[in-house]
């Protein structure tokens, strides 16, 4: 399982190439509607590779995974936010990476701060800092 919420709209996510059986993400990270999320469950030969136990039962919606009425306006809003984010994915990645690098360069001037993982592959908008030893 992967919670891809922080990656959504920042890097390309291809569930066919990603080695996960379950992936979740939330619309608000794309400036979409709050309270709207997506759940991807990998299928092989038309069957889910992971079976989920419903937390809310009743009704036949959501393939029996969750009861209740679909939030159609929220789902449409999530789709539109994803469409817009995809159009600006590369420019947003570069912008965030530039801001992160600037932030870390400023922090590097402080003796009491250690920046962790600078040489590691990482998301363009994530910094990891700690007190210097």
Predicted regions and their residues:
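Pyridoxal 5′-phosphate
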Residues: 1-133
């Amino acid at each position: 399982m992967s919670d891809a919420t922080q990656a959504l709209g920042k890097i390309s996510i291809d569930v066919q190439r990603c080695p996960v059986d379950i992936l979740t993400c939330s619309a608000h990270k794309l400036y979409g509607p709050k309270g709207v999320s997506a759940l991807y469950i990998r299928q092989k030969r038309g069957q889910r590779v992971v079976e989920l136990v419903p937390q809310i039962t009743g009704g036949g919606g959501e393939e029996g995974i969750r009861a209740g009425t679909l939030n159609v306006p929220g789902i449409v809003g999530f789709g539109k936010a994803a469409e817009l984010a995809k159009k600006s994915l590369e420019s947003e990645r570069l912008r965030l990476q530039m801001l992160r690098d600037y932030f870390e360069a400023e922090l590097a001037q402080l003796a009491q701060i250690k920046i962790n993982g600078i040489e590691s592959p990482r998301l363009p908008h994530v910094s990891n800092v700690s007190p210097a030893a």
